[in-house]
């Protein structure tokens, strides 16, 4: 049976974590793919996180202060500091809890187990899961051309990668329902193999064994476009939750 071992990390008090977010998810869903913030700027705000790139060109993983770009052809690249992003979520990762997991845990089961470790489901939580996976299924999306189509349509042309048995790290955030329209409620995770040769947006996995680290975040710093045109014409009164579920999961 799957086993769990939980430990408080050393220290008298839980470290304070904050999240820096570039853009809003409903704008991305509507097709606002033009990059607004340079990766060099993003790296000053966090060492762990996820997102996408200008024109929706692949999946972003920020791990140990290094940025990686998983493109639709499966190649992993290192973006330049001048590369831009329309949407990203990063944090200076200082975990307060460490949890050992084993026994063939699926992504869905993992979410239930992690929820049980949280003080409640209305907190913002960053997490890292490093270990060996029996199977890992990820995706990436090709760069888009104007006029941009909505994200749901763009993901119909996504590349899906069945990585099989591998070692690596899942980086993600668990957001409360009250972020609807701004971020992704629930779980949003990206993956990078230990050899930095494959990864992407997590669709499914089965974990053999690994270490989960959790950081509760008490602040969100939201950075919005200042050019005046990026969000122009987007209907933010529209409920896009169904689109989000289909595009992200």
Report the location of each language-model feature.
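A glycine-rich, hydrophobic loop/mini-helix early in the fold
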Residues: 70-117
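N-terminal low-complexity or amphipathic/hydrophobic leaders
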Residues: 24-89
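A hydrophobic, small-residue-rich beta->alpha segment in the mid-to-C-terminal subdomain
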Residues: 193-235
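Bacterial N-terminal signal peptides that target proteins for export
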Residues: 1-2
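Histidine-centered divalent-metal-coordination microenvironment in nucleic-acid enzymes
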Residues: 184-192
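Long, positively charged binding patches that form subdomain-scale interaction surfaces
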Residues: 108-173, 180-182
């Amino acid at each position: 049976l799957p086993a769990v071992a939980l430990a408080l990390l050393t220290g008298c008090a839980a470290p304070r974590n904050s999240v820096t977010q570039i853009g809003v998810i409903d704008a991305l869903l509507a097709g606002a793919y033009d990059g607004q913030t340079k990766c060099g700027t993003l790296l000053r705000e966090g060492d762990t996180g996820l997102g996408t790139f200008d024109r929706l060109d692949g999946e972003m993983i920020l791990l140990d202060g290094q940025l990686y770009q998983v493109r639709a052809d499966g190649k992993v690249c290192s973006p330049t500091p001048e590369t831009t992003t329309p949407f990203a979520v990063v944090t200076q990762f200082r975990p307060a809890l460490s949890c050992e997991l084993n026994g063939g845990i699926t992504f869905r089961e993992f979410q239930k187990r992690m929820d049980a470790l949280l003080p409640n489901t209305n907190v913002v939580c960053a997490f890292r899961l490093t270990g060996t996976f029996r199977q890992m299924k990820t995706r990436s999306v090709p760069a888009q051309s104007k006029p941009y189509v909505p994200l749901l349509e763009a993901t119909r042309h996504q590349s899906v990668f069945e990585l099989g048995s591998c070692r690596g790290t899942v980086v993600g955030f668990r957001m409360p329902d009250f972020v609807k329209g701004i971020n992704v409620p629930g779980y949003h995770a990206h993956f990078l193999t230990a050899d930095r040769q494959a990864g992407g947006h997590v669709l499914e996995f089965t974990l053999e064994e690994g270490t989960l680290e959790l950081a509760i975040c008490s602040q969100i710093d939201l950075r919005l476009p200042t050019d005046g045109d990026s969000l122009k014409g987007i209907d933010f009164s529209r409920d896009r939750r169904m689109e989000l579920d289909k595009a992200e999961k």
